[in-house]
Regions:
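Loop-to-transmembrane helix entry/capping segments in MFS-fold secondary transporters
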Residues: 47-48, 134-146
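Transmembrane alpha-helix termini and helix-breaking/packing motifs in multi-pass membrane transporters
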Residues: 69-74, 96-97, 156-184
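C-terminal ends and interior cores of transmembrane alpha-helices
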Residues: 82-104
Length: 196
């Protein structure tokens, strides 16, 4: 290992980037796999449509091995980590706007499909950064942090933010919003939070 690589590995503590990297890895997967079903159910979509489309948009995580070998041909792993995080945030913002559209379901599914490709690409790049930036010993040392923050993303998304959508729904309903409008408003706020 050359001196430059060794210095870059020692310059920034893994505790400063491993937790956020794996939290960001877990969030799109959990939102598309679990939270989107609650969102669509609240907005009146049938169970059959929800099951079909949410399972279909999860395919990028299954087939990500197809484009994994080509990522470093174009740019670095770090580039793809940053780019996919920004792209996913922007797309969640678009989804927040899409729930207000007349054909919101089709548009939101389309946006979520792009989030899925972005999230799957982020998974590939994030694992690559983890392996290339950390020594074998450090990889073993921080594997617990990796898993903890990936699972924290699950807890925040499925527990905290789904609860928050329900809390907002109650508030919007209390001020006279119709049921559908109250759900649209509450999910707009939650999807906007996923932007950050």
């Amino acid at each position: 290992m050359n001196q430059l690589t060794q210095n870059s590995r020692q310059s920034l503590s893994p505790l400063r980037w491993v937790p956020s990297l794996y939290f960001a890895m877990g969030l799109p997967f959990v939102v598309l796999n679990m939270v989107s079903a609650v969102l669509f159910k609240d907005l009146g979509i049938s169970d059959a449509q929800i099951a079909f489309w949410t399972s279909l948009i999860m395919w990028p995580w299954t087939i990500k091995f197809l484009w994994s070998p080509f990522l470093e041909i174009f740019r670095t792993k770090k580039f793809f980590v940053v780019t996919t995080q920004l792209l996913s945030g922007i797309l969640f913002g678009l989804a927040a706007l899409a729930v207000h559209m007349p054909h919101f379901f089709a548009v939101t599914v389309g946006v979520f499909a792009v989030v899925a490709f972005s999230g799957a690409t982020h998974d590939i790049a994030a694992d690559g950064v983890y392996m290339s930036e950390l020594s074998t010993e450090d990889q073993a040392r921080y594997i617990g942090w990796q898993g903890a923050f990936y699972n924290l993303a699950k807890l925040v998304a499925t527990g905290g933010l789904v609860w928050f959508a329900g809390f907002l729904y109650e508030g919007f309903s209390a001020v006279g919003a119709a049921t559908f409008d109250a759900y649209v408003r509450s999910w707009t706020v939650v999807l906007a939070i996923f932007c950050g």
